[in-house]
Each structure stands twice: as structure tokens, then as C-alpha cells.
Swiss-Prot record:
Key words of the record: Amino-acid transport, Cell inner membrane, Cell membrane, Membrane, Symport, Transmembrane, Transmembrane helix, Transport
Descriptive protein name: Serine/threonine transporter SstT
GO molecular function: neutral L-amino acid:sodium symporter activity
Membrane topology note: Multi-pass membrane protein
TM segment ranges: 22-42, 54-74, 89-109, 148-168, 189-209, 223-243, 305-325, 337-357
Compartments where found: Cell inner membrane
Function: Involved in the import of serine and threonine into the cell, with the concomitant import of sodium (symport system).
Length: 414
């Protein structure tokens, strides 16, 4: 397939095919940018990279407003006494995170990995204690609503939208209709933004590969193999088992749909928060209950941290093995779970799980200097690690929501 044919695919066909075309074109541009730089006088990959920057910026800009109006409208229009599926979804989120940590601990001990610690990185923004992380979480909940939207504090946005939605359940029908119209209007804007995903992926891939390349990953092949292998095992073995537990039929068609439609986009945006609009659009196409997914998907972007659990656990155990420390399997599992649950404070941020490595390392008695260097390792492999982690986190949000909604449909049909 020639390049002109690939360019034409950016404008026609289904979204997935167009994204695939953008991916291939991004790789091509990244490969030819360096040889062409002397001829054309500039780095082509850096120039087209602005497309990716604009796409991610647009997604992140619309996400807080989308969550605010969608959740508020869904709760305000919800009939009093209607059964909610949120409890089951939250259980799946937490269970999925627990099992991801469990699988990561097994992988960490089965394939012990040592790394050459990179140059010391600044870790001043990393949380120092569990209490501090929890305090930050509480302060985010009670943040000023306008400030929460302005700074994309999704926990604060979610808290205020839930509070206002519940308070407006007794409002007049006219008020509820206005909220629904606002939510619908923002959803249409999201649909337009998502239609530009192929161009965003094209820019992101071209700039990322041109800037960092794959050569820098050579020294961390085993660590990457353990990390990505564990995430793939969670996505295609652990998660399908949980989904089958709910829907009682072959889970893989649903799993593959979520990975293809949500995971691919999340892989390139590297932000669960930026992928919220994509997940909501997918949930709508799957005909899921809007009152459920409008709350569960934004919530999942903050608390469904299977990928973060794996990253924190594997990198911390790599530090343990590098230093030659002896840690029991049970201690490693428990401490990693604590760190993964606290990762809620860093969710929705590209590379956010890396900030929790000092927390996990401190629980093992590892010094801040070593922990900071492990963050450096995380940034080096982040081109693949962070992308895969976000794809797992975000696709699981819509996967578990769909599983619970389908379970409810199955029960109602019985």
C-alpha cells in the first residue's frame, strides 16, 4: 500500500481503519524525518506532532465539561427508587485492581528483574506517605467547582456533578431538560473531536518515535517484557474471567471491542482522563444504560487502576531485586495493593503511576534516592509502559461497565 493510499484512508472508512492508517503514517514520518531534515531544513515529525498535541488538548479540555453535565443530567433525570448498578461496577474495579496486583507480584517473583539505575530524577512531586495521598484525595473532592473544571480535577468535578445531580432530582422538568440539552450538546462536540483521532494518532506517533525512538528501550527489554506481558495477561485472561462471571457467555467479543475501540486510542493519548469521551461514545454505541456509564466511566478513570497496580508493583520489585533485598511474597502483595489503591491520587495523568513508586519503595524501606532513580527508569520505558498501562486502565473502565449492564439485562430477561 503506497503512501498516498494511506493518506486517503485518513479521510474515509471506519474510525479504527483510519486510526490504523494514522499509526502507519506516523511511523513512516518518524523514520524519514531525520534523513530529510538536512534537505528541508526542519524536523517533519516535530511539525506534524502539533496535530497530536491539539488532539490531546481538545480531549482533555472537553472531558471536565462532559463529565460535569453528563453526570449531573443523568442523576437529575434519574427516577427516585430506580436501582443503581454502581456497587457492582465499583466491586469489579477494585477486584480487577487487586487481581492485577496479584498477577504482577507473581510475575515479579517468577521473572526477577534487575536494572541499571538511571540518572537521578526530580521526585519532589511524588507523594511521601499514604496519609498525604489520602489528604490530597479529600482536598480534591471538596475543591471549588469552577477551579475543579478549570484545572481538570476530575475527582472534584465528579463530586460536584454527583452532588448537584442528586440535589436537582426534585427540580422542574424544564430544568432537567436544560441539563439534558447541555449534556447532549457537549456529547456532539466530543463526537466531532473523536472523528479527528486518526490525525491525532498520526502526530503523536510521529513525534514520539522521532524524539525518543525505540533504541532507548534496548537496555530494559526484560523489564518491559515482564511489564507488558503482565498487562496483556490481565487484559486477555484475568479480565475475561471477571466478565464471564458477570455475563455468563463468551467474553472475548466484548473484550476485543473494548480493546480495539478504547484501548487503541488510550494507548496513544496516554491519559485515562483524555480517553473518557472515547469511552462514553463507545458505551453509547454499545447501548449501555446512560445513567450508569455516565457515572461509572469517569469514576473508573479515577479508581480503576489495574495498569497502575502492575506498573508500581513490577518497578518496585525490580528495585528490590536490584538492591538484593529479601521481601516475602505476602508482604510484597499487601504493600503493592496499598500503593495501587493510593494511585487514585495520581490517576488521569500521563505517567501518573510513576509518582507512586517512592511511596511503594518507602513501604519496602528503599531510600528516596533509589526510588527517584526508578522513576527515571519509568520515564525511559514510558514510551511503551505508560501507553500500555493507560490502554489497560481505560479499556477496562468501559469493559466492566458493559459487563455489569449486560448482567442486568440478562437478569431482567430471565
Amino acid at each position: 500500500m503506497n503512501t498516498s493510499r494511506l493518506f486517503s484512508l485518513l479521510f474515509q472508512g471506519g474510525l479504527v481503519k483510519r486510526i490504523a492508517a494514522g499509526l502507519v503514517l506516523g511511523i513512516v514520518v518518524a523514520l524519514i524525518s531525520a534523513p530529510l531534515q538536512e534537505t528541508i531544513g526542519f524536523n517533519l515529525a516535530e511539525k506534524v506532532g502539533v496535530l497530536g498535541t491539539i488532539f490531546v488538548k481538545a480531549l482533555r479540555a472537553v472531558a471536565p465539561i462532559l463529565i460535569f453535565f453528563l453526570v449531573m443530567a443523568a442523576l437529575a433525570n434519574r427516577k427516585i427508587g430506580t436501582k443503581s448498578n454502581m456497587k457492582e461496577i465499583i466491586v469489579l474495579y477494585l477486584l480487577g485492581t487487586f487481581l492485577a496486583a496479584f498477577v504482577a507480584v507473581i510475575a515479579g517473583f517468577a521473572f526477577p528483574t534487575e536494572v541499571v539505575l538511571a540518572a537521578k530524577e526530580d521526585s519532589s512531586s511524588a507523594p511521601q506517605a499514604v496519609g498525604q495521598v489520602l489528604l490530597t484525595l479529600i482536598l480534591n473532592v471538596v475543591d471549588d467547582p469552577l477551579n475543579a473544571i478549570f484545572k481538570a480535577n476530575f475527582i472534584g468535578v465528579l463530586a460536584w456533578s454527583i452532588g448537584l445531580g442528586l440535589a436537582l432530582r426534585h427540580a422542574s422538568d424544564a430544568t432537567k431538560n436544560v441539563l439534558s440539552d447541555f449534556a447532549e450538546g457537549v456529547s456532539k462536540i466530543v463526537h466531532v473531536i473523536i472523528s479527528f483521532a486518526p490525525f491525532g494518532v498520526f502526530g503523536l506517533v510521529a513525534e514520539t518515535l522521532s524524539d525518543k525512538g525505540l533504541v532507548a528501550l534496548g537496555g530494559y527489554v526484560q523489564l518491559l517484557a515482564v511489564l507488558i506481558g503482565t498487562m496483556l495477561f490481565t487484559a486477555f485472561v484475568v479480565n475475561p474471567i471477571l466478565v464471564y462471571w458477570k455475563i455468563r457467555r463468551n467474553p472475548y467479543p466484548l473484550v476485543w471491542t473494548c480493546v480495539r475501540e478504547s484501548g487503541v486510542t488510550a494507548f496513544f493519548t496516554r491519559s485515562s482522563a483524555a480517553n473518557i469521551p472515547v469511552n462514553i461514545e463507545l458505551a453509547k454505541r454499545l447501548n449501555l444504560d446512560e445513567e450508569t456509564y455516565s457515572v461509572s466511566i469517569p469514576l473508573g478513570a479515577n479508581i480503576n487502576m489495574a495498569g497502575a497496580a502492575i506498573t508500581i508493583t513490577i518497578l518496585t520489585l525490580a528495585a528490590v531485586h536490584t538492591l538484593g533485598l529479601e521481601v516475602s511474597f505476602v508482604s510484597a502483595l499487601l504493600l503493592s495493593i496499598v500503593a495501587a489503591l493510593c494511585a487514585c491520587g495520581a490517576s488521569g495523568v500521563a505517567g501518573g503511576s510513576l509518582l507512586l513508586i517512592p511511596l511503594a519503595c518507602s513501604l519496602f524501606g528503599i531510600s528516596d534516592d533509589v526510588a527517584a532513580q526508578m522513576i527515571g527508569v519509568g520515564f525511559i520505558i514510558g514510551i511503551l509502559q505508560d501507553s500500555t498501562e493507560t490502554a489497560l486502565n481505560s479499556s477496562t473502565d468501559v469493559l466492566f461497565t458493559a459487563a455489569v449492564c449486560m448482567e442486568e439485562e440478562r437478569k431482567n430477561a430471565a
